[in-house]
Amino acid sequence: MDFKVSNRMSTLKGSAIREMFKAMADPTMISLAGGNPAAELFPNEILSEIAADILKNNPVGALQYGISEGNVALREKIIEFVKERENLEVSLDEITIVSGGQQAIEITAKILLNEGDSVIVEAPSFVGGLNAFRSYGANLVGVDVEEDGINIEMLKETIKSTPNVKLIYTIPNFQNPSGVTMSVEKRKALYEIARDNGIFIIEDNPYGELTFDGIKLPTIKSMDSEGVVLYSGSFSKILAPGLRLGYLIAPKNFTEKAVLGKQVSDVHTPCLPQLLALEFMNRYDIVELIGKMRELYKKKCNIMIDAMKEYLPSQITYTVPGGGLFVWCNAPGVDTLKLSQECVKEKVLIVPGNNFATDQSLVNNGFRLNFSTMPDDKIVEGVKRLGSVLKKYYN
């Protein structure tokens, strides 16, 4: 039966990244397009043992309905974790367990946005965040990302010239897609600007632990004394994304609304993944696992950067990230949507920059590469194939 799509859904397009998974059915295809963590670091055997123990000894806790706020013991464990790792002082009634960091963004949009309200985002920005805001009829306004994070002067001018700004969305650590990390000075400035203008900040921090040198900058939330910052954390990049497990840290009055948002979305995050994460953190050192991730991703990033130096045309500029999963490239004069289509023919996948833009219809010269999932030799071969396509534009 034919049907008319709602206004909120009519603005959404399928993620090109998800569409590219279809091309991976070809065994000769090399994907530099994903955003997945390295599967070889999933603690499969440990989680299998924990799951068996839970289902044997606590089947009701795993399989019965739970509370919308999330498992109390897991929230208490996260409170310990963020105090130790991020210097955050959080109470139990300020944390909601969510079904991945994506849901933290979506619930925040649900709570705060009316159709036509404005959201300031980094340009470029995470497509999942952009689509969450689009689904609530938001006006998206981009502010450029510089080498040390969001352009503060441009942010000030954008706030002055844009009506009904409700939110600023930022990924300050190893940003998706740019790989850029925001400086401490800009974090402080961003917080003060938002506070002084009565605007909430969503601080999305899925990559913060994946710093190659082990040095972590203070979160914006750690600077927050007035409930301005809504902090999204995730287990997707430090344990396993299939658990669909994250957390939203917010003031108590906001958390109460987030719980209502959970109740109308999915009632609660599934209990078994919550218990798996809790017991993993109780029995094993998650920081040790994070250390292995840092070591592996640093090696893979270096392999990619070395290959880019060797095989890409000199006209291509790119970030050299200090952590995370991504390298952002700029190809002057090249429509990277067309480039990505040509790359498919050469058996390599990249993500064109328009996917990360507030206006996806405009020609974009940027593209994103991922180094976390492919074997080392395929990273090199993938960059080599990409270089052969790019050289056609510059020779």
Outline where the language-model segments fall.
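Conserved C-terminal alpha-helix-loop-beta "cap" of PLP-dependent enzymes
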Residues: 329-368, 381
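Conserved core segment of the aminotransferase class I/II
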Residues: 225-295
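PLP-dependent enzyme catalytic core of the Aspartate aminotransferase-like
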Residues: 1, 345, 360-395
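Conserved glycine-rich beta-strand-loop-beta hairpin in the small C-terminal domain of fold type I
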Residues: 278, 295-305, 317-330, 344
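N-terminal small-domain helix-loop-helix segment of the aminotransferase-like
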Residues: 10-100, 107, 282, 349, ...
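Conserved core of the PLP fold type I
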Residues: 61-198, 202, 208-226, 297, ...
